[in-house]
């Protein structure tokens, strides 16, 4: 089966919107053992859409079309598909009724423009979208099935999981057994990870993939076939051992998710006092439902005055050592923990750049501390001088990893290949 994707929309084509839908779809398909062979992005021009539908349908078996199903004049996917096949649009009475019911339930009057979303090509098969007003559909043109989905990410994801994947599995008899193991890493470059993994002799049916999503690099271990799937846990365990401290989570999208899972199941509590990370530590945890059970408070103490008045940092500590220092960040962590007697508190203070660095403390210098009931762990690291956002996100990741290691009763301070550390 040859799978392709067509993404529509001027805002996507011009770069005004980053096409996260395409990245998610490709990754999701890969996790099911299905590889996308081609992706095309087209603007909101009827003739261009018609041309690409006709041309790509000669080469692909299945094409997922994303976007262009809304009620406005620049939503042209249904019209373009009808013209590409030489047929008219007709109203789908079932979807019109769904639209009317949706607006009634939400105590809103349905705009006339929304009726456009019930207009489908004559030969179209309706594809259910239970979470939105855009009607999905599929049409056979030349050798390909074109499967139309809305551009709203939540709606796309629902339709792909509930409609698209079952359809292609049935249509093309895709019964191959596939399993996937993910290892999340921090502090090591992709090439450094590959240098350790590539010499390993992998069993037949097992392959390795890498995905960089800073501050993480995700290692995907694919197993295809029953024999390979049976060997997957052993292979993943061996790779994890080879990579050592680089691996910080298994089958989690982010290190924040790993911390959320462990705190949620531990009954322990966390507070944070953030300077250079500016709320990243707490914000990423709040993304997960249930975080209120362990996250007591998060303070952004950016100024020296706030460090003194809110956290109780000694002014003499700031005068003698500066805001970006181990003594200061240790007092920040202790102060944050003491406010509500949390089990743990994380604190960060650093120079994210692009300016503000000195010879002794260049941009990328970050002090991080973890306060516990029995003491304080701290380190001052030197991060690669890249973007301000990367310095901040890497700082949050290292802070999370310190907490993760404490929760696992492991050494809290460890070496990372691409992160330096100042001596105390």
UniProtKB/Swiss-Prot annotation:
Q: Where are the transmembrane segments?
A: none
The entry's keywords = Hydrolase, Pyridine nucleotide biosynthesis
Phenotype upon gene inactivation: Not essential for growth on defined medium, loss of NMN amidohydrolase activity.
Reactions catalysed, semicolon-separated, are:
beta-nicotinamide D-ribonucleotide + H2O = nicotinate beta-D-ribonucleotide + NH4(+)
A GO molecular function held by the record: nicotinamide-nucleotide amidase activity
Which Pfam families does the UniProt entry name for this protein? CinA, MoCF_biosynth
Q: What is its EC number?
A: 3.5.1.42
User: What is the top-level taxon of the source organism?
Assistant: Bacteria
A GO biological process of this protein is: pyridine nucleotide biosynthetic process
Q: How does activity depend on pH?
A: Optimum pH is 5.5-9.0.
Which PANTHER family did the record assign? Answer: NICOTINAMIDE-NUCLEOTIDE AMIDOHYDROLASE PNCC, NMN AMIDOHYDROLASE-LIKE PROTEIN YFAY
Function, in words: One of the key enzymes of the pyridine nucleotide cycle which permits cells to recycle the by products of NAD consumption back to NAD. Has no activity on NAD, NADP, nicotinamide or nicotinamide riboside.
NCBIfam families xref list: cinA_nterm, molyb_syn, PncC_domain
Subunit relationships: Homodimer.
The similarity comment for this entry is: Belongs to the CinA family.
**Protein's name in the database:** Nicotinamide-nucleotide amidohydrolase PncC
What is the protein's species of origin?
A: Shewanella oneidensis (strain ATCC 700550 / JCM 31522 / CIP 106686 / LMG 19005 / NCIMB 14063 / MR-1)
């Amino acid at each position: 089966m040859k799978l392709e994707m067509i993404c529509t929309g001027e805002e996507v084509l011009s770069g005004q919107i980053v096409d996260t839908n395409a990245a998610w779809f490709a990754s999701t398909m890969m996790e099911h053992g299905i590889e996308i062979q081609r992706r095309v992005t087209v603007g909101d021009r009827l003739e261009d859409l018609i041309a690409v539908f006709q041309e790509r349908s000669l080469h692909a078996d299945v094409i997922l079309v994303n976007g262009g199903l809304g009620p406005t004049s620049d939503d042209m996917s249904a019209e373009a598909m009808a013209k590409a096949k030489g047929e008219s649009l007709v109203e789908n009475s079932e979807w019109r009724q769904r639209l009317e019911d949706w607006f009634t339930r939400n105590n809103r009057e349905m705009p006339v423009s929304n009726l456009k979303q019930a207009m489908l090509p004559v030969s179209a098969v309706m594809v259910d979208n239970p979470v939105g007003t855009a009607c999905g559909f599929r049409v056979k043109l030349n050798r390909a099935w074109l499967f139309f989905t809305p551009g709203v990410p939540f709606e796309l994801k629902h339709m792909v999981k509930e409609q698209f994947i079952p359809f292609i599995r049935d249509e093309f008899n895709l019964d191959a057994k596939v399993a996937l193991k993910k290892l999340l890493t921090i502090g090591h470059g992709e090439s450094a990870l590959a240098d350790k993994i590539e010499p390993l002799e992998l069993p037949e049916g097992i392959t390795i993939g890498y995905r960089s999503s800073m501050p993480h690099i995700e290692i995907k271990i694919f197993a295809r076939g029953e024999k390979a799937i049976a060997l997957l846990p052993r292979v993943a365990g061996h790779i994890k051992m080879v990579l050592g401290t680089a691996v910080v989570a298994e089958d989690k999208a982010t290190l924040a998710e790993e911390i959320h899972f462990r705190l949620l199941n531990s009954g322990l509590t966390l507070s944070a006092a953030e300077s250079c990370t500016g709320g990243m530590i707490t914000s990423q945890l709040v993304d997960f439902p249930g975080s209120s059970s362990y996250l007591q408070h998060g303070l952004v103490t950016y100024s020296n005055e706030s460090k003194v008045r809110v956290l109780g940092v000694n002014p003499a500590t700031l005068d003698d050592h500066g805001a970006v220092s181990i003594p200061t960040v240790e007092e920040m962590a202790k102060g944050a923990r003491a406010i509500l007697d949390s089990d743990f508190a994380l604190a960060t203070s650093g120079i994210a750049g692009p300016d503000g660095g000195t010879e002794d403390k260049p941009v990328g210098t970050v002090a991080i501390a973890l306060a516990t009931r029995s003491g304080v762990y701290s380190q001052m690291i030197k991060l690669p001088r890249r973007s301000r956002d990367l310095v901040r996100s890497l700082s949050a990741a290292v802070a999370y990893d310190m907490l993760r290691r404490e929760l696992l009763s492991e050494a809290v301070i460890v070496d990372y290949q691409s992160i330096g550390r100042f001596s105390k």
